[in-house]
Amino acid sequence: MGERKGVNKYYPPDFNPEKHGSLNRYHNSHPLRERARKLSQGILIIRFEMPYNIWCDGCKNHIGMGVRYNAEKKKVGNYYTTPIYRFRMKCHLCVNYIEMQTDPANCDYVIVSGAQRKEERWDMADNEQVLTTEHEKKQKLETDAMFRLEHGEADRSTLKKALPTLSHIQEAQSAWKDDFALNSMLRRRFREKKKAIQEEEERDQALQAKASLTIPLVPETEDDRKLAALLKFHTLDSYEDKQKLKRTEIISRSWFPSAPGSASSSKVSGVLKKLAQSRRTALATSPITVGDLGIVRRRSRDVPESPQHAADTPKSGEPRVPEEAAQDRPMSPGDCPPETTETPKCSSPRGQEGSRQDKPLSPAGSSQEAADTPDTRHPCSLGSSLVADYSDSESE
């Protein structure tokens, strides 16, 4: 190891180049150090790389091609002038030793003991590989003209069979002849694809931010598009639209509160409508009398009592009919006095003046006058909506 270094060598004072020759001889050591410990037996320790796949006979494990070992190398023979070397190494998985040696005749390695080769060899002719011409065949082609002619015919037939394949290979190679244009086209496609991927990532990130999603989104498919086309979404109203809708609702609402029992109130209103309609039909069919109109005939004070009034007044020996019973008894049009059945006539302005002269005006006003005047209603009248005065103003 020290011989490989060109500097930093130490020569002791007793070193004599004529006597020792080199530092290795002075130190009585070999340049390969421990690797040459068996050099006296003709064995050199080297790094050996496995040439092919094998199976170990000791542990039955597979040892791949390219695995390196510390192997003992020694010469065991010659193939003509080429030496044959044998390599002995220990399996790294067990205590078994594997021995291999070179085969110069076949340019290969042969397993001597300790392992089995994994067969992965094929015939070159079957694989359509180029076969090397043997030395004897070369000499025969040079000396024998007939053999050379036959070999030429075989080569031409092989060429005709291989022409389609060769033309296809040439076309494939011509497509890649302009490498600059092809490189530019490939880089342009890569840029377009990268831009599309970036746009898709931006859309996905926007959707994830909008929906607050943390899961990764997968690319959409045709089935997803069909399923999305079947869905229908309604547009959500904004805050202003909702407020406008509420205002419209409030404006169109009724001012009067609805009764709690709307169904019962509707039934009651229906019954009232029916009663009013029946009343109208009854009034239309029956004749209207003076008593029905509520007309009362007012007489003067000096007019003698009418015979009807005298008849109504009970005598001293007769029992008096209570007023409530008389009011409860329904009266027919025949019970009314004859003077009430007359058609009312409007009094003249003169009659109005006479009636006003009968009653002096009080300073209190019309309210006091209405309180002093007794309410005399005819028993046949239904109300006091209309009053007619038939008193003789001229007699007064």
Curated annotation (Swiss-Prot):
GO CC, alphabetical: post-mRNA release spliceosomal complex; U2-type spliceosomal complex
Keyword Phosphoprotein in record: yes
Coiled-coil region: 182-214
Disulfide bonds: none
Residue ranges of the region described as Disordered: 1-26, 295-396
Bias type Polar residues, positions: 340-350
InterPro entries, alphabetized: Saf4/Yju2
Single GO BP term: response to virus
Phosphoserine, modified sites: 40, 306, 362
Induction: By poly(RI), poly(RC) and Newcastle disease virus.
Basic and acidic residues bias: start-end ranges: 315-327
Keyword Methyltransferase part of the UniProt annotation: no
Subcellular location: Nucleus
This protein's UniProt keywords: Coiled coil, Nucleus, Phosphoprotein
Pfam families, per the entry: Saf4_Yju2 (PF04502)
Protein family (similarity comment): Belongs to the CWC16 family.
Known role: May be involved in mRNA splicing.
Protein name (database record): Probable splicing factor YJU2B
Gene, per the UniProt record: YJU2B
